């Protein structure tokens, strides 16, 4: 059945009839929403079919009647029906709404909240939204396309997703560009201008290092060879500035492999970045190492080192076989201790132990694979730590006493005869007690001693060639091998994984305490030397001076130390050659084997 709208009032009545039936069907509260502007401005597209099939099967063709009827609302104003018509409409009880002339001049249209759709029920139970449109040609009810109002289409979703990805990529690229622009100089912490001589550095440090390696660099530090080098104080000491350049890894041959000139490198980098962006989606795993070029590609020239092919049990056997022999002291029980006599006994014992320490170090797996310069450097940095951990190990079975030799067992009270010795005695006794509490095994002890040797100077190499980096890499791999051996020993002892991790951490923490004791002992020994309490033997003296050149900043050193800096530097400059002479002598079999 088709109904035609002849008047404005009858059209409004039909609208309210439709809305009333809908609300009764859905059992929903009636809503009154004031129409703030013409419906033609609220609703859009009117190109949908205008025939609606009610559940009863009756059909109402509004398009046919729209041409013959006037619009419900005009653009210039609104007109309402007569009072009688409005009263008749109210009496009919279409939805129970009050007469139109009893409300404010603003018309009330029975629509749902935005998007103002009327969800009529289809016979199959689905809600199909319809909207009203005020056209100049007439009044029509049109079906609203759900995609236009409820959710974006798939194309819109893809487009918005691409926009979000593009904005995210732009932000990420901006962050990466800003990160690239904030490189700092490894020497003075100023802004880096580029990658020079193997490290990121500023123009000032680059030029300084270039002058130093091309000309004479016999710089002399006026203080303790430990001056602070930063942006403001980098020009205060040339010697310490050059030392720090070497420490951070500057080297004469440290030039990037992709160095081909500015313009070619720029084009290559842009091309690589473009290819990288295209491959991000397929790779799925962008590693941080790909963001920046590797400074240097270190070749593992010592891959075939026998030390790296040893099993854990073979490593332990090699370390146990390398242990030095037992050494006896010249102690005479009939003579009472004095400061000079005790220091004489201890320094004589240390000097003889140093001779055997060189032979022991050569038998540590992987040590002889290093250059002679680096072997000497490691020994100069670690000799007192090695002596102290051996002393602590021997004293485990003697609580409260230190076993310097089988015939020299000293307690804390006997150490008081030497000024400043009690503090060192207390630290040694505490470490021995800690070993005893942990029930340290001999296999673990030899591993710890080897770690001390290899780790002592690995970060203070003064070599300026690519070979020094290869040496460091080799040392790190041997250290990893020894650490794995320690873990193997703990697993072999039946410890759980958590207990293995805890014990390994406890053992390695003790090494830092031994380093602290070594620094204290070095200061004490140097003070004894300056006071001429006891003459030092040649090898011990050379090792002492060399260690002080490589050691970190001394804290609270005596004023006399600063007075002897030039003498120390002069003596220390020949220490490596003296120790190398011991190496050569030992190779020839001329080392004394006093035990």
Swiss-Prot record:
Post-translational modification: Ubiquitinated; regulated by LATS1 via DCAF1 it leads to ESR1 proteasomal degradation. Deubiquitinated by OTUB1. Ubiquitinated by STUB1/CHIP; in the CA1 hippocampal region following loss of endogenous circulating estradiol (17-beta-estradiol/E2). Ubiquitinated by UBR5, leading to its degradation: UBR5 specifically recognizes and binds ligand-bound ESR1 when it is not associated with coactivators (NCOAs). In presence of NCOAs, the UBR5-degron is not accessible, preventing its ubiquitination and degradation. Phosphorylated by cyclin A/CDK2 and CK1. Phosphorylation probably enhances transcriptional activity. Dephosphorylation at Ser-118 by PPP5C inhibits its transactivation activity. Phosphorylated by LMTK3 (in vitro).
Gene Ontology BP term (one): positive regulation of cytosolic calcium ion concentration
Domain NR LBD: 311-547
CDD domains in the cross-refs: NR_DBD_ER, NR_LBD_ER
Annotated spans, Required for interaction with NCOA1: 35-47
Region Mediates interaction with DNTTIP2, annotated ranges: 185-310
Annotated stretches, region: Interaction with DDX5: 35-174
Modification sites for Phosphotyrosine: 537
Segments of this protein annotated with the region Interaction with AKAP13: 262-595
Region (Hinge): 251-310
Keywords: Activator, Cell membrane, Cytoplasm, DNA-binding, Glycoprotein, Golgi apparatus, Lipid-binding, Lipoprotein, Membrane, Metal-binding, Methylation, Nucleus, Palmitate, Phosphoprotein, Receptor, Steroid-binding, Transcription, Transcription regulation, Ubl conjugation, Zinc, Zinc-finger
Keyword Membrane included in the entry's annotation: yes
Region (Modulating (transactivation AF-1)), start-end ranges: 1-184
Region (Disordered): 149-173, 257-287
Cited Pfam families: ESR1_C, Hormone_recep, Oest_recep, zf-C4
Basic and acidic residues bias locations: 154-165
Residues the entry annotates as binding 17beta-estradiol: 353, 394, 524
Lipid moiety-binding residues (S-palmitoyl cysteine): 447
Renumbered zinc finger spans (NR C4-type): 185-205, 221-245
Single GO MF descriptor: nuclear estrogen receptor activity
Residues the record lists as Asymmetric dimethylarginine modifications: 260
Description of how the protein assembles with itself and partners: Binds DNA as a homodimer. Can form a heterodimer with ESR2. Interacts with coactivator NCOA5. Interacts with PELP1, the interaction is enhanced by 17-beta-estradiol; the interaction increases ESR1 transcriptional activity. Interacts with NCOA7; the interaction is ligand-inducible. Interacts with AKAP13, CUEDC2, HEXIM1, KDM5A, MAP1S, SMARD1, and UBE1C. Interacts with MUC1; the interaction is stimulated by 7 beta-estradiol (E2) and enhances ESR1-mediated transcription. Interacts with DNTTIP2, and UIMC1. Interacts with KMT2D/MLL2. Interacts with ATAD2; the interaction is enhanced by estradiol.
Entry text on domains: Composed of three domains: a modulating N-terminal domain, a DNA-binding domain and a C-terminal ligand-binding domain. The modulating domain, also known as A/B or AF-1 domain has a ligand-independent transactivation function. The C-terminus contains a ligand-dependent transactivation domain, also known as E/F or AF-2 domain which overlaps with the ligand binding domain. AF-1 and AF-2 activate transcription independently and synergistically and act in a promoter- and cell-specific manner.
Record-given protein name: Estrogen receptor
Native source species: Felis catus (Cat)
